[in-house]
Amino acid sequence: MKRIIATALAAASLTAGITTATITTGAGEASASERTDQGQGRPDRYVLPGDAAGSRFEGIGVDQRRGLFYVSEVTGGEIHRGTARDADAEQWLAGDGTDGRYTARGITVDRAGNVYIAGGPNGIGNPDRPDLWVYSHDGELLAALRVPGTADAFLNDVAIGADGAAYFTNSNDPQIFRVAPAGDGWAAELWADASGTIDRVAGFNLGGIALSADGSAFVVAQGNTGALWRFATVDGAVSAIDTQGADLVNADGLVRQGNELTVIRNFSKMVATMRISADGDTVHRVAQRASDPDRVYTTAKVLHGRLLAVDSKFDEQPAPSGPYDVVGSPWA
């Protein structure tokens, strides 16, 4: 397998820990107390800091042990952090070139609290820019990496495997990259290439990724075709998952809770739920429901038993406006 050993590619300084951000509230925005679910003691939505020129968001990762969530900003690459019980999130990592990051997409957290960030097109046409980053829970830059073997990787989403490594999907080619510590640094390697099975077609190809219940496979969404694919964790072998004829076009984030899989269909403004086998091979009992018509949800994660979904603002043109939200229990 092709491998690249990590060192930081950008020397820009990083401020560890949470950086306090000023949050401008929009007209008619509810107060923090009004946004709180009094029965659970948690907000029903969380406000993200935004740029004066407008912001868009995409990924979310959660740290169950510390009760934290992290949200990636597409416009600039900032990373925001919040807690389960605080209605206002704060900027955690700066963007606009910090550590070579100008945009950010998928994000996840491992058991140690390390935060993995997919760069989307960050490195395309810019060989000195990383494709992905790894930070410790206190904000220390651990790795800023290019992936091997391709100059136009669009790293979309990321999930932690049963082996503790992080697996990143490529929305341009049907590839998955594995990132893990190696020696005295970090390594990114091409883990699976399904070019002989999955066709690269116009639009976003591989995106959302979730580990099966038994850890034997990743379930991966191909948004432009609405297909679901199974990648065996033992060797990366790929096979199609029969979705029972379900319309899953614009499939983006995947959330697995036990044997239920949720597929968030961003611009379709729909959410599909289905039963999925423990090995990720078979789905059945597919149901669809509309999501909020005024929001474009991209993905979600479960924090302390509750689903948190990112409102991307992707549908607001030419520039989005606040307030910017992560929504709790968005389609309960």
Please give the residue ranges for each predicted region.
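Beta-rich, blade/repeat-based domains predominating
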Residues: D51-R66, T98-G119, G123, P148-A166, ...
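Blade-level signature of beta-propeller repeat domains, shared across WD40, Kelch, NHL, RCC1
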Residues: T299-A332
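Short loop/turn segments that connect beta-strands within beta-propeller blades
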Residues: T83-A87, S136-E140, A180-D184, A232-G236, ...
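Asp-box/WD-like beta-propeller blade repeats and closely related beta-sheet repeat scaffolds
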Residues: R42, N126-D163
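Short glycine/acidic-enriched loop and turn motifs that connect beta-strands
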Residues: G76-E78, P121-G125, D173-Q175, T225-G226, ...
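A short loop-to-beta-strand structural motif that recurs across blades of beta-propeller domains
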Residues: E78-H80, P130-W133, Q175-R178, A227-W229, ...
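A short helix->beta-strand "capping" segment at the edge of beta-propeller domains
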Residues: T36-S55, H284-V286
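Secretory targeting and sorting signals
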Residues: M1-A32
